[in-house]
């Protein structure tokens, strides 16, 4: 009873399985009690305390527990529709799931490395052969045909009951049953029933060796699928480490109370913005004294109109993460963009407003991930890196146990540090970083990352170097011509290019088209 109670409170997805306990009790008692009346009485007696626990849990969950994302008002039950939805889920979690297992690991669209494909193939082949022989060695006796047939039907009915019961809490909460992330987590309660159903299907194969070989093949395929899933998460974790390290280079110290805004572009398909909220807090607040978070991280499209009321200045921001809370204001915001192969960028309305001039046609091969999503444009005026990022903190060391050692310094290191120096107008440092990077030689994947170096060279009188970088950048991505035009026009208006502006006209002639400033 204690274990059952802990299970109910520990993982509410599973409470529907508690409804199937009478079926297990019935199968266990049937051989010893031939009388139907006695069986019903015995099952009722044994199940009564578990039913009391279940009813008590449901009362607490629905009427007493208020601090939850899924409020009681969102729960809706339709007796007419419940059977349809429960039955519709069975082919998805059984046949659909196994179809995915067969198709996913070796699909050419997955993009697995040849070495991983070789490992998975070896596991599939060796696992099938070894497991088939191992399973056969476990058979020590033959079950009588008549008894086997009766037992098989019992297990079929029990497996169906388990699958139907598994879907009850999901139906009540109106959760969809899908095989894609993140809804695939709702298939977890079905594991027991689907496994039992598969075992029943395998029992229909009379030839032992064929039955065991097929079972071994399915188990081996499941193993390769788990390896594939582990590789997906490993790759995404490496990408998160890359994100974190570039953020640390660009912002070695962020003022507490800062809200970071970004946009979900599918770079991290298995993480949401809440995961990055805690990543940022673990890095910049290594010894929190309270449950109040000093930083938060929002995807604009997911939070706008909710925790993020508007994109106007002076709006209060509050987010309850259950285990911690954040209180901030739209007056203290950093706008971030991360879309590999481009480096991470903390956007500045002074330097980045012109990037939005570039077209964003997804069919344009020159664009891809190299421009900013339109949703960031409205938030750009709120971003204020000058006030909320420390000018210099080279001693910043995020926890190694979490983020690992600093990786080898590549192009993005020099870009992030140059962008940090540009933030405070340290143009000499920007040129020094550029000289080192270009002499290695490093080059950006995103032409927009030439901008700080072009501006620094121009401001320090190295006009030819600035012009050369402009030509290289535009040659790599002609769609950004207007962005570079805007940079040169701004420099000319500040008098950086001299009184005659002859150099500006030369640049404009090369670029071919420049909008009127």
For the regions a protein language model found, what residue spans apply to each?
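Polytopic membrane enzymes that build or remodel cell-surface glycoconjugates and lipids
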Residues: 1-298, 311-316, 322, 327-332, ...
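C-terminal luminal/periplasmic domains and tails of membrane-associated envelope-modifying transferases
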Residues: 251-256, 264-517
């Amino acid at each position: 009873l204690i274990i059952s109670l802990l299970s109910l409170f520990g993982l509410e997805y599973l409470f529907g399985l508690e409804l199937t306990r009478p079926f297990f009790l019935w199968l266990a008692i049937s051989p010893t009690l031939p009388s139907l009346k006695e069986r019903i009485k015995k099952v009722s007696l044994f199940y009564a305390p578990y039913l009391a626990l279940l009813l008590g849990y449901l009362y607490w969950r629905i009427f007493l527990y208020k601090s939850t994302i899924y409020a009681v008002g969102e729960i809706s039950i339709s007796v007419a529709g419940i059977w349809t939805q429960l039955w519709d889920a069975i082919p998805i979690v059984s046949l659909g799931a196994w179809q995915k297992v067969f198709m996913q690991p070796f699909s050419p669209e997955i993009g697995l490395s040849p070495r991983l494909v070789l490992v998975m193939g070896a596991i599939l082949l060796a696992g099938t052969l070894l497991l088939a022989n191992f399973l056969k060695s476990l058979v020590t006796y033959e079950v009588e045909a008549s008894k086997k047939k009766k037992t098989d039907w019992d297990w079929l009915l029990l497996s169906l009951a388990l699958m139907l019961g598994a879907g009850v809490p999901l139906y009540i909460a109106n959760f969809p049953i899908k095989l894609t992330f993140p809804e695939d987590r709702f298939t977890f309660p079905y594991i027991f029933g689907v496994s039992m159903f598969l075992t029943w299907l395998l029992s229909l194969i009379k030839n032992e060796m064929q039955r065991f070989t097929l079972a071994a093949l399915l188990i081996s395929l499941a193993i390769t699928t788990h390896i594939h899933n582990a590789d997906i998460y490993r790759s995404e974790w490496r990408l998160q480490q890359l994100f974190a390290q570039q953020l640390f280079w660009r912002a070695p110290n962020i003022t507490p109370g800062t809200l970071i805004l970004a946009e979900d572009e599918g770079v991290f398909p298995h993480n949401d913005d809440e995961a990055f909220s805690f990543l940022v807090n673990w890095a910049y607040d290594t010894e929190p004294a309270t449950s109040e978070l000093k930083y938060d991280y929002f995807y604009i499209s997911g939070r706008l109109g909710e925790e993020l009321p508007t994109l106007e200045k002076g709006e209060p921001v509050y987010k309850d993460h259950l285990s911690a809370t954040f209180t901030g204001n739209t007056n203290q915001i950093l706008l971030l963009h991360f879309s590999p192969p481009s480096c991470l960028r903390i956007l500045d309305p002074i330097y980045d407003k012109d990037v939005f001039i570039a077209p964003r046609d997804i069919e344009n091969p020159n664009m891809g991930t190299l421009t900013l999503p339109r949703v960031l444009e409205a938030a750009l005026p709120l971003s204020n890196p000058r006030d909320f990022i420390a000018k210099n903190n080279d001693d910043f060391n995020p926890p190694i146990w979490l983020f690992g050692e600093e990786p080898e310094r590549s192009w993005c290191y020099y870009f992030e540090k140059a962008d940090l120096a540009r933030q405070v107008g340290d143009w000499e440092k920007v040129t020094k970083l550029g000289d080192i990077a270009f002499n290695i030689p490093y080059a950006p994947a995103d032409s927009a990352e030439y901008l700080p170096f072009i501006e620094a060279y121009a401001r320090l009188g190295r006009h030819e170097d600035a012009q050369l970088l402009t030509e290289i950048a535009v040659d790599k991505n002609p769609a950004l011509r207007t962005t570079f035009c805007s940079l040169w026009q701004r420099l000319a208006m500040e008098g950086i290019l001299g009184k005659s502006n002859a150099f500006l006209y030369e640049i404009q002639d090369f670029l071919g088209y420049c909008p009127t400033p």
